[in-house]
Amino acid sequence: MLNTMFKNILSIMLVGTVFTAVAQQPTAAMKSKLAPKQLMTDITLAGSKLVAVGERGHILISEDGEQWQQANVPVNVLLTSIDFKNDNVGFVTGHDATLLKTTDGGLNWSIVNYQPELDKPLLDIKVLNNNVIAVGAYGLFLQSTDAGETWQDSFQDELLIEDDRLYLEELKEFEPDTYIKERQYMLPHFNSINVIGEELYIAGEAGFLANSDVNGADWQVIETDYFGSYFSIVKVEDSLLLAGLRGNLFKSEDDGESWRLLNTGVKATINSAFKDSQVTYFFANSGNVFYTLDNEVINNYVLDDGKAVMAGVVLNNFVYLATEAGIKKVPTSEFTSNKARD
C-alpha cells in the first residue's frame, strides 16, 4: 500500500531566469517487460493513445489499453505527472526537478530541466494552449508561455504568509545572500496545478490553496480552515471539490468562500481527480476509487489488490488506472449508480 508517507515523498530557481538546466548527465531509463506492472503515478491521453508515467523513468504508451510500449526516456528518476498540448507535444515532471518534453506523441523524450542538486521534485504539470506550468516542492514553479520552447522559474512571494513575506523583504534589502538561501524552503509544497475554466488552482500542503488567472499571474491564497495537505481540485457544474489526506473531500458552492466536508466513508488519501462527462472520479490509496454522479453522494469502488490508485483516465468505456502495482482497467459500468452507505 502507498501510505501517506509515500504521498508526502511525492510531494517533497530564481526569479525571471530563462533556462534549460542539466547540471549533470542522468542515467537513461532501462527497458523492462515488467514496467506495466510496476508503480505508475499518472496517466493521460495523447489523442487516442494512453500514456502513463511512473518509477525508474518509465513512460508507457498504448493504442488499445492492452499492449504497452516503453518510450525512450533520458532519466531513470521517479516521474510524477504528464500532460499533452496536442497529439504530439507533451510534458512530464519528476524527481530531481526533472522536466521532459516530447514532440512525437510520447515515443521519445528530451530533457528540459534536470537539477538533482536542488533536492526538489516537480510534482505536477498542466498545459493550456501555449502556457505550460510545472509546480513542485517548496513552491517550485516553472512556466513557459511558448509551448515549452523557453522557460522561466519564479518565486511566488504573494503566496507567503505575511510574517514570512516581511521577513524576506528585510533580508533581501540587507542580506541578499541569506535571502536567496532562506526563501528556498519558505513556501509549501505545491502538490498539483489544475485548470478550472479561466482560472488556475494550486493545491498544496498544510491546507494550501491558491488561484490566479489562466496565465498564472496575480495569485491569491484561498482560506479553507483545514491544515492537512490537498492533492487535487476539480469543478463540477457550480461546485468546487477539493481532495486531500485521509479521505477528506470538501465542497464549495460559492467559489471557495466556504467549504463543507463530504462523507467518503474511508480514511484513504486522495491522490488525484478526473472529471468525465457524467462521473467525477477521485483516485485514492488502499485501492479506493471514490466517485460521484451528483457532486454530493460519494460512492466507492475498491480494487481487489488494495494497491494505491494514483490517477486515472477514461477511454472506450474503461477507466484506466495508474496504480502502485501498474496499469489496471475497470469498466465504466462499475461507476454508474449511487450506492447506499451505512
Label for each model-derived stretch:
Residues 18-20:
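N-terminal signal peptide c-region/cleavage motif recognized by signal peptidases
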